[in-house]
Every structure is written in structure tokens, then in C-alpha cells.
Amino acid sequence: MAAVTEVVVPADGAEARPLAAEELAAQKREQRLRKFRELHLKRNEARKLNHQEVVEEDKRLKLPANWEAKKARLEWELQEEEKKKECAARGEDYEKVKLLEISAEDAERWERRKKKKNPDLGFSDYAAAQLRQYHRLTKQIKPDMESYERQREKHGEDFFPTSNSLLHGTHVPSSEEIDRMVLDLEKQIEKRDKYSRRRPYNDDADIDYINERNAKFNKKAERFYGKYTAEIKQNLERGTAV
């Protein structure tokens, strides 16, 4: 008797299970690839940002130590210049407008700080007086940022000098700058003449000096110590001094 072979025909559900498993694996693989691409983009972005930070830090290290303070000061001065122009356009006095915006406490604190920073100790010698005048004049110099930007655009990379730069002596001041310098010098000369005018000579006065400088010294000595030496001088004139 011949053997009978049984053939099992798979159902539709059995065929669907391997297909579903393959689709699930493909979806997981696609998710992993997508996540990998996102991580790759984030890594490139982080690398770019780190490079920018390194460049910015290198620039900051090459700047002067007080660069931030200078920058803030220049920005404040630019704002002050803009306010002055606005007041001039309206026909107002900037100093008066500024005083209206400052409280009494701020004004007093500002005066104390100014006196502490640059105290007036009186005349000591000509070198100290000249140094004090130099500091006062340099504080009055206002930066011209428009001219600065024009020169920087004109010279490009050569504007920031190196060991091979040859920019010295090539700058030609404008007529406005020359006029401003002349006006400032005229003001200095006028002020100097006002405070150092020659006193008229009195022929009837007693001559107790050997030159003009000694005469000024004697006047100062008389002003401070005259009341203490008056009796001694009288005794010397009468011949009764001990």
C-alpha cells in the first residue's frame, strides 16, 4: 500500500506575520538613521559654535584690558553728542537741559568723585601745573567716529598696523580739524593772558626784591607771614631790635 504524503498549505495570517516583522524592522532602522543624521547635524553645529567662541575669545584676549570700559565710555559720549545736536536743533541750551535731568544727589556725588579724581592742591611747581593742564585738555578731546569709520574703510586691513605697516605720516587733517585746533589754542592763549597779566609798576613802592620772580615770592611771604613779622620789621626800622 502506497504511503500518503500530507501537504500543509499555510494560511494567510502566517504569511502576513513575516511581512509585518520586516516592516517593523525597516521602520526601526529608518528611525535609527534619522536619529543618527540629527545627531550628526547637531555635532556639526556644536563644532561650528565652538569654533566661533574660540575666535571671539581670541579677539577678546588680544584687546586691551580696559576695552569694555572704553567702549562703554565712547558709546556714552556718542549719546551725549546726539543729545547736544537735538538740543541745538530745538534752540535749547544743552547744559541747562542736562541739569534739569540730574538730581541734587547725583550732582553732589559727581562733584565729589571729580574732586577726588583730580583734586586741586594748589600750585606746587610748573611741571605739576603743566601735567594738570595736559590731563584737562586731553579730557576735552572728543572722538570722531565718522572719520574713524571712513579711514577704516579706506585702508582696510592696513588700518590695524603691524610691523610692516607704513601708515605713519600719511594722515592729512581736514580744514575743520585745523580750525578747531586753532580755536582751542586761541582760547588757551586768552586764558593764559588773563591769569598771568603783568601788574603795573609802582615807582613809589619800596624795592625789597632783586627780580620779578623774587618780588612775587616776597608778596606771597608777606601775605601769609606779614602779621607775624610786622613788629620785628618796626623794631628794625626804629633800630630798637634786640
Curated annotation (Swiss-Prot):
The answer to keyword Transmembrane applying to this record is no
Subcellular location as annotated: Nucleus
Q: Where are the annotated coiled coils located?
A: 65-91
Q: Does the keyword Coiled coil apply?
A: yes
Grouped into one coarse class, the protein's main location is nucleus
Set out the biological process GO terms recorded for this chain's protein.
embryonic organ development; gastrulation; in utero embryonic development; mitotic G2 DNA damage checkpoint signaling; mRNA splicing, via spliceosome; positive regulation of cell population proliferation
Q: Which residues carry this modification: N-acetylalanine?
A: 2
As annotated, the Glycyl lysine isopeptide (Lys-Gly) (interchain with G-Cter in SUMO2) covalent link is placed at: 142, 233
Give the GO cellular component terms, alphabetically: catalytic step 2 spliceosome; nuclear speck; nucleus; post-mRNA release spliceosomal complex; Prp19 complex; U2-type catalytic step 2 spliceosome
Q: Which UniProt keywords apply?
A: Acetylation, Coiled coil, Isopeptide bond, mRNA processing, mRNA splicing, Nucleus, Spliceosome, Ubl conjugation
Stated role: Involved in pre-mRNA splicing as component of the spliceosome.
- Entry similarity comment: Belongs to the SYF2 family.
What does the record note on quaternary structure? Identified in the spliceosome C complex. Interacts with CCNDBP1.
| Protein name per Swiss-Prot or TrEMBL | Pre-mRNA-splicing factor SYF2
Classification from the root reads: Eukaryota, Metazoa, Chordata, Craniata, Vertebrata
